[in-house]
Regions:
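Catalytic strand-loop segment that frames the active site of acyl-thioester-processing enzymes
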Residues: 2-40
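Generic structural detector for well-ordered beta-strands
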Residues: 12-18, 76, 120-122
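Hydrophobic beta-strand-centered segment that forms part of the acyl-chain substrate-binding groove
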Residues: 53-88
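HotDog/MaoC-like acyl-thioester-processing domains
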Residues: 92-142
Length: 142
């Protein structure tokens, strides 16, 4: 991690919601989802918040050797966003505790605030992390 990654870092990230990021597309094999409204799925919104945070911190990491993984999501989802709307995420790094980063997040779709909350990420060494995943897979196959 570079010294530039510190509390107070702010960022903004925008994304135009396509049809394939709506609830029916979240788990196509789940018939229940197929009957639900065509609005941004909460699962995709969480992924969008993760993407915004990754995009904000990557210039402050030794990318791609250093990467980050999500370890906590505490977000509400208070308004529906139809396809074609642009979601804008505004965030601030509120804590840097070793390799653990905490973000304050707010998202809106140009009409409503759709989310507010916090997200935490942990900075990892990608090679070491991938090795531990490989070892875990080997345990299940043994």
């Amino acid at each position: 991690m570079k010294p530039s990654l510190k509390v107070g870092l702010t960022f903004e990230f925008s994304y135009k919601v396509p049809e394939n990021k709506t609830v029916p597309f979240l788990f196509p094999e789940a018939s229940e989802f197929q009957k639900m409204p065509d609005v941004l799925a909460t699962g995709y919104m969480v992924g969008l918040v993760e993407w915004a945070c990754i995009d904000a911190i990557n210039p402050h990491l030794d990318w791609p050797r250093e990467q980050s993984v999500g370890v906590l999501v505490n977000l509400d989802h208070t308004a529906a966003t139809p396809p074609g709307f642009t979601v804008t995420i505004k965030g601030t790094v509120t804590a840097v505790e070793g390799r653990k980063l905490t973000f304050s997040i707010e998202a809106d779709d140009g009409v409503d605030r759709i989310s507010r909350g916090t997200h935490q990420r942990y900075v990892i060494d990608a090679e070491r992390f991938n090795q531990s995943v490989t070892e875990k897979i080997a345990k299940i196959r043994a």
